């Protein structure tokens, strides 16, 4: 029998394929930007539609022509900055060196966490006096889902977002201005900018190896045994155990995933400009600020989506605002 050469089915890079610990995605890498302000933002996925725009990709076959582009609508009400947290170098890494909480906190914040009474490093003067010892400034920000009509919850999602700037002093000054305020997405991102999106994907429960790993179905005589959708071989006799590399059934979906280099097509404040007739299926009407992101975004509707500036932007063309001629508002009911 001839030797068969083929790549293995499914990627081991995402193992173990288990449920995400939290629906708030964890982002470990951020762009060192010179612009003073928050390095990321968060919103809630409302649905998808399409736009007609002028193709502005250089050397494209349709450059300068009208093209149809699918977009994802993300509702992004203002985020509230509840605290700032400073970090200092420690053993080759960093560790928290103090934090300062705002005075006018949202009442909904107590639904998510217990606000600390003994606040370490709660004096702004103390933090400013040790600015030479600090290496990074971050803020604790949370969403305001009470403002949303499509997300039926009141408990805010809390996350830590770095503050960018040319120096630690500039970062601290920017964080002081953000403390206790509400930040709009238009203060963070620009139209046409490249961003990365992170979210938890749709959960599909326990699935077999064919759907979970993409293995081939059993062929011809092998399927006559009554087992069609299973892996043909679990491994050798010895070692007398099944390797973790063997594709088997298990949890599928509800994993944290990050997609790189998504283009911001539009940022607006009037949700009626993009809400389809009858509202988005399973979501409703967009009533706050919104973003149109080119392509798809992981997760179902109502899922939290975190965004950051692109950490490895492509060199296709410089970011610029696209020329959008039409946004589809046709009903999505029954589609």
UniProtKB/Swiss-Prot annotation:
Q: Does the keyword Heme apply?
A: no
Q: Which domain of life is it from?
A: Archaea
What SUPFAM superfamilies is this protein classified in? Translation proteins
Q: Which UniProt keywords apply?
A: Ribonucleoprotein, Ribosomal protein, RNA-binding, rRNA-binding
Q: Which GO terms describe its cellular component?
A: cytosolic large ribosomal subunit
Q: Which PROSITE patterns does this UniProt record tie to the protein?
A: RIBOSOMAL_L3 (PS00474)
Region labeled Disordered — which residues? 1-20
Look up keyword rRNA-binding and say if it applies: yes
Q: Name one GO molecular function term.
A: structural constituent of ribosome
The record's annotation in Pfam families points to: Ribosomal_L3
InterPro entries registered for this protein in UniProt? L3_arc_euk (IPR045077), Ribosomal_L3_dom_3_arc_sf (IPR044892), Ribosomal_uL3 (IPR000597), Ribosomal_uL3_arc (IPR019928), Ribosomal_uL3_CS (IPR019926), Transl_B-barrel_sf (IPR009000)
Gene Ontology biological-process entries: translation
Q: Assembly and partners?
A: Part of the 50S ribosomal subunit. Forms a cluster with proteins L14 and L24e.
Function description = One of the primary rRNA binding proteins, it binds directly near the 3'-end of the 23S rRNA, where it nucleates assembly of the 50S subunit.
Protein family (similarity comment)? Belongs to the universal ribosomal protein uL3 family.
Q: What is this protein called?
A: Large ribosomal subunit protein uL3
């Amino acid at each position: 029998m001839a030797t068969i050469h083929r790549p293995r089915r499914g990627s081991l890079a995402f193992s173990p394929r288990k449920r995400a610990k939290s629906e708030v995605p964890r982002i470990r890498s951020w762009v060192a930007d010179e612009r003073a302000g928050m390095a990321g933002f968060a919103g809630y996925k409302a649905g998808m539609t399409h736009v007609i725009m002028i193709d502005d990709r250089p050397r494209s076959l349709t450059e300068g022509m009208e093209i149809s582009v699918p977009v994802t609508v993300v509702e992004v009400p203002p985020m509230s900055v509840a605290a700032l947290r400073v970090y200092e170098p420690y053993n080759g890494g960093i560790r928290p060196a103090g934090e300062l909480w705002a005075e006018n906190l949202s009442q909904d914040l107590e639904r998510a966490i217990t606000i600390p009474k003994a606040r370490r490093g709660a004096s702004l003067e103390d933090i400013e006096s040790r600015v030479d010892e600090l290496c990074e400034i971050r803020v604790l920000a949370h969403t305001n889902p009470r403002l949303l009509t499509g997300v039926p919850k009141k408990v805010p999602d809390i996350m830590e977002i770095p503050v960018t700037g040319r120096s630690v002093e500039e970062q601290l000054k920017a964080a002081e201005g953000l403390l206790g305020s509400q930040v709009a997405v238009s203060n963070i991102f620009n139209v046409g900018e490249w961003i990365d999106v992170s979210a938890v994907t749709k959960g599909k429960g326990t699935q077999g190896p064919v759907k979970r790993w993409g293995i081939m179905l059993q062929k011809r005589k092998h399927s006559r045994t009554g087992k069609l959708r299973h892996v043909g071989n679990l491994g050798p006799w010895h070692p007398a155990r099944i390797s973790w590399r063997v594709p088997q059934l298990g949890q599928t979906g509800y994993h944290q995933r990050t997609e790189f280099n998504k283009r911001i097509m539009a940022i607006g404040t009037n949700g009626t400009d993009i809400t389809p007739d009858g509202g988005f299926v399973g979501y409703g009407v967009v009533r706050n600020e919104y973003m149109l992101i080119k392509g798809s975004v992981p997760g179902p509707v109502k899922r939290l989506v975190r965004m950051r500036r692109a950490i490895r932007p492509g060199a296709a063309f410089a970011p610029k605002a696209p020329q959008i001629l039409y946004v589809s508002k046709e009903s999505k009911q029954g589609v």
